[in-house]
A protein has these predicted regions:
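Mature N-terminal, pre-catalytic/accessory segment of carbohydrate-active enzymes
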Residues: 1-72
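Carbohydrate-binding surfaces of carbohydrate-active enzymes
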Residues: 57-75, 79-468
Length: 468
């Protein structure tokens, strides 16, 4: 009946009543009859109910041949996470005990902002609590969704960033197609390197992105292939190799009176047959086709694996990766690697090698102020004992700057970016400039004993005998 009956020792006591409830967040894009509370992201059972009443119904309605690897419906995409965080679910006390090795009940006052034991002990509990939520979200939401998708013959794509109560890399590693996002505005932030790092580490061929997103000020039918090209080249050089236009809308109307048709409000480049330059878009599409084909081939050549433990990326960059300090000097490539990727690494001829075949020359650790967990310290020690080069965040730039870069150019004001891939004895570099105007520089590549060729993705022309 809500009455507490107990005998307490002498002294002053505060009685805390601790409970949990559903988040007051509803799906933002549902139809009038499709609105409701967001699914519990820490519960496999809740996700199965949601899946059975949404995706599975769609797959069954389409029937054999229309949903699956050869049908028009091939992929389920988890968009950027924008529905608020979550830190509890039914039975989470058992999940926490399995993860942390101790009961959560004595520590519940800490979740109400109180110190339990000492400040240091309470901080350690917070760390264990966050890690338990992190792993539960990645496994019970993304991991279970991937299992359900595969059971329906579908692939899972994930945009692993936003308000997620998890680690971006751990969450995204469950994707068959790691997916990013970039906006049409040239200097806007993007998350391509994060998705590309996951793909390289886990052996995923495709790195996709929600591409050329806009708001009302940047959209409004103002974008053209010319205005989009510089940003497109830049994200290609960050690791992207599949464009997903935001947005391409079905336009069922033929009457001019119904133009411009379905627009998805103010968001996104209007990429469909109602565009004024639609009939002239073939060269733009052929350009992207040629770029993406080559960027999907071969293996990524990378100097540095930058170890980012759970929570590190979000703590350092929040929602803007451009603000993150990078320990790698210009001319050297790098990937972000997670806790699970670190555990999978082995050393071969002094290089760090992953089961996917991805190789790195150097492992760079987080700043010394970022405390590593015992398992992480043991993993780093194992690799160092096997002969890997491991540098601290603070020393990495100085050590690497004394070496030959993979790419160098004679005009630092040019601010170029590039990506290097290799296959069957051939090396190819895609070089990008952030400018919308021509840029002339002399570029050097860390390749010897080869004769260069220039491949033009605008025309498909290959020029041999390039001066070098």
């Amino acid at each position: 009946d809500g009455t507490l009956a107990c005998t307490l020792p002498p002294g002053d006591w505060t009685v805390l009543r601790v409970g949990y409830r559903a988040l007051d967040r509803q799906n933002g894009t549902g139809t009038r009859l499709g609105k409701g509370l967001e699914c519990d992201k820490l519960s496999k059972e809740a996700l199965r109910i949601h899946w059975a009443n949404y995706v599975e119904k769609t797959v069954k309605a389409l029937g054999p041949g229309l949903a699956g690897p050869n049908g028009p419906l091939r992929t389920v995409l988890n968009d950027s996470y924008e529905v608020g965080t979550q830190n509890w679910t039914h039975g989470f006390e058992r999940t926490f005990a399995e993860h942390a090795g101790y009961a959560i009940t004595p520590w519940l006052p800490a979740l109400c902002g109180r110190v339990v034991g000492s400040v240091a002990e309470t901080e350690r509990f917070y760390r264990d609590f966050r890690l338990a939520v992190t792993d539960a979200f990645a496994a019970n939401y993304a991991g279970e969704m991937r299992r359900l998708a595969h059971a329906c013959g579908l692939q899972l794509a994930i945009e692993p960033y936003g308000e997620i109560p998890s680690d971006d890399l751990l969450y995204g590693e469950h994707a068959d197609i790691p997916t990013a996002e970039f906006w049409a505005k040239l200097d806007s932030p993007h998350w391509v390197r994060q998705a590309a790092s996951i793909a390289h580490a886990k052996g995923r061929r495709l790195v996709a992105a929600e591409s050329f997103t806009t708001n009302a000020q940047e959209g409004r039918w103002q974008n053209t292939p010319w205005s989009m090209k510089a940003k497109c080249d830049w994200v290609y050089s960050e690791g992207l190799n599949r464009i997903i236009y935001h947005r391409f809308a079905h336009q069922p109307w033929t009457s001019p009176a119904r133009l411009p048709g379905m627009t998805m409000g103010p968001f996104g480049v209007h990429f469909d047959r109602t565009q004024t330059w639609w009939k002239q878009a073939k060269p733009w599409l052929k350009y992207q086709q040629r770029c993406q084909f080559l960027l999907q081939e071969g293996a990524f050549v990378c100097d540095v694996a930058w170890y980012c433990p759970a929570g590190y990326l979000y703590i350092n960059w929040g929602h803007n990766p451009h603000k993150m300090p990078v320990p790698v000097p210009t001319g050297f490539s790098y990937d972000f690697v997670s806790d699970t990727t670190l555990a999978e690494m082995r050393v071969e001829n002094g290089e760090l090698v992953l089961p996917s075949g991805q190789r790195y020359r150097t492992l760079v650790l987080p700043e010394q102020a970022f405390e590593l967990l015992p398992a992480s310290r043991a993993g780093v020690a194992r690799l160092k004992a096997a002969g890997a080069e491991i540098l601290t965040f603070e020393e990495a730039k100085g050590v690497l700057a004394a070496r030959a870069p993979d790419v160098a150019w004679n005009d630092r004001a040019a601010k170029l970016n590039w990506i290097h891939r290799r296959d069957a004895g051939a090396d190819w570099y895609f070089v990008a400039s952030p400018r919308e105007t021509p840029c002339r520089v002399d570029v050097s590549f860390r390749v010897a004993g080869r004769v260069p060729e220039l491949w033009n993705p605008e025309t498909g022309e290959v020029t041999k005998g390039v001066p070098y």
